[in-house]
Amino acid sequence: MLNTTFANAKFANPFMNASGVHCMTIEDLEELKASQAGAYITKSSTLEKREGNPLPRYVDLELGSINSMGLPNLGFDYYLDYVLKNQKENAQEGPIFFSIAGMSAAENIAMLKKIQESDFSGITELNLSCPNVPGKPQLAYDFEATEKLLKEVFTFFTKPLGVKLPPYFDLVHFDIMAEILNQFPLTYVNSVNSIGNGLFIDPEAESVVIKPKDGFGGIGGAYIKPTALANVRAFYTRLKPEIQIIGTGGIETGQDAFEHLLCGATMLQIGTALHKEGPAIFDRIIKELEEIMNQKGYQSIADFHGKLKSL
């Protein structure tokens, strides 16, 4: 019922973790692999291992979360070794998603060259929604720099590649970014990363709740679902059909998943809710989505995918 075709591969369902959640270590990744998730993605890696920002840097909130993690990860080679080994031992399984998030364009190019030269046959996600040069916006808010990077990437990269984007809030920005992305043989766009630089306050203590950046951090969870749905829809209606969409942001229930699929997402990533509930969330959310589809008389996701009605 939930069978999904994505990047020319077949998955039992559209659900996966969002990079950053439950995917830091091999143990985490193995738990995801053993769960009901249709697919899973590694922690966004940098060339070298990173400790990330000082604690506390992640706090669950009533309707979501705030974080300023600072890209903690065990380094590119740790994750590449894992995916290559896994690929060899489990050749019959669907492809693994491998996430990278270089601290500069040069670092992204270096990692993509290593992936290109390796035997990795899965899907790579390039995170364009993390810090760039100090004093400049994160890469995907710098349209010129994004276009320049992708031009360079596709001079050598021939494997399936998706990009993870921050949320946009201006219709003109959707137009500009879609025009850039449509130039390239991208496999997918992942919308959205957390909404940057929110602030959550503990009124009792009269203080912020996370330590880095004076308490400013990315907001996730139910708080961001309307923004995520808007971004999914905006890109679904603007991108060439060969570029598929992963919907991320505020997916906690079967209904949230249904709404993302209705807007045009093909795969769905869960972050905040997975952090709160653990991999058992996939069992629950699959049942809830199937129940909604049964109530509506839908046999498959294709029956309603992308078919959001306007008034």
Curated annotation (Swiss-Prot):
Subunit structure: Homodimer.
Protein name in the entry: Dihydroorotate dehydrogenase A (fumarate)
Family annotation (PANTHER family): DIHYDROOROTATE DEHYDROGENASE (FUMARATE), DIHYDROOROTATE DEHYDROGENASE (QUINONE), MITOCHONDRIAL-RELATED
Keyword annotations: Cytoplasm, Flavoprotein, FMN, Oxidoreductase, Pyrimidine biosynthesis
Organism placement in taxonomy: Bacteria, Bacillati, Bacillota, Bacilli, Lactobacillales
Protein function: Catalyzes the conversion of dihydroorotate to orotate with fumarate as the electron acceptor. Molecular oxygen can replace fumarate in vitro, but cannot use NAD(+) as an electron acceptor.
Alphabetical list of HAMAP family matching this protein: DHO_dh_type1
Localisation per UniProt entry: Cytoplasm
Annotated effect of mutating residue 67 to A: 100-fold lower affinity for dihydroorotate
Catalytic activities: (S)-dihydroorotate + fumarate = orotate + succinate
Family indicated by similarity: Belongs to the dihydroorotate dehydrogenase family. Type 1 subfamily.
